[in-house]
């Protein structure tokens, strides 16, 4: 040890001192992109899914919602999106809460069109929001919701709403969002109370992708229903401005 001290100088440490040093901090490697994310990247789709946890993507021209976990699809549903006159906005937001048995009041443009009377619709199966609605962001009045016109999901072209997204498999989506089973979803939806359940802030992407992977190696191409082309720069704001940007009272 004396020889080591001479060679290394007074700053050297003994074996005992070295043993007492705290272990080096573990450096964690970034999560590997999921196979689906790799397909998105290969196609040049401008969408970055969380590598861990849940996310919801609505591809407007595909009329489809996909619920992802750890970057992989877990639930797919047909949806009805905004019409070209009242387009669904292209935005990134998050789940805020789930409202069971919502009330509803139409937007001013709906009233002006004569499509709906200016009144508050009570909860129930005749309500245009259906039996439940997923609220997005704080103060963001675009919902993912059930509908009283479920036969419209049979149409191939489903750009029919005033901006909100009607979800065919709404009950399964709500069960997935809240981590509850379908029996509990239906019990709340068919009950007598109107109430909110706070939800985790799951990221929600309302996107406009004309090419999108299907998860089996195939790539689907979709019609440009809003005539936005492939570049969504200034068109993004224009799309939002053209939409009602609200489902009105819920």
Model-derived features with residue positions:
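Bacterial N-terminal signal peptides
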Residues: 1-9
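N-terminal pre-domains immediately preceding structured catalytic cores
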Residues: 11-250
């Amino acid at each position: 040890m004396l020889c080591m001290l001479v060679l290394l100088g007074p700053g050297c440490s003994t074996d005992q001192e070295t043993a007492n040093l705290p272990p080096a901090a573990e450096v964690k490697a970034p999560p590997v992109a999921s196979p689906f994310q790799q397909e998105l990247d290969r196609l040049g789709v401008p969408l970055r899914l969380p590598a861990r946890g849940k996310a919801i993507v609505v591809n407007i021209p595909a009329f489809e919602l996909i619920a992802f976990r750890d970057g992989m699809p877990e639930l797919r549903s047909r949806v009805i999106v905004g019409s070209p006159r009242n387009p669904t906005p292209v935005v990134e937001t998050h789940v805020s809460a789930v409202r069971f048995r919502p009330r509803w009041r139409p937007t001013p443009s709906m009233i002006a069109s004569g499509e709906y009377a200016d009144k508050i619709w009570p909860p129930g199966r005749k309500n245009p929001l259906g039996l439940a609605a997923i609220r997005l962001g704080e103060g963001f009045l675009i919902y993912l919701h059930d509908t009283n016109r479920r036969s419209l999901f049979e149409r191939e072209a489903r750009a029919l709403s005033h901006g909100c997204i009607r979800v065919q498999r709404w009950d399964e989506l709500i069960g997935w969002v809240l981590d509850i089973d379908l029996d509990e979803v239906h019990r709340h939806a068919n009950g007598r109370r109107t109430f909110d359940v706070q939800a985790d802030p799951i990221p929600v992407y309302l996107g406009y992708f004309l090419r999108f992977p299907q998860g089996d190696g195939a790539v689907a191409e979709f019609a440009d229903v809003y005539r936005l082309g492939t570049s969504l720069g200034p068109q993004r704001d224009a799309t939002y401005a053209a939409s009602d940007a609200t489902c009105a009272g819920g």
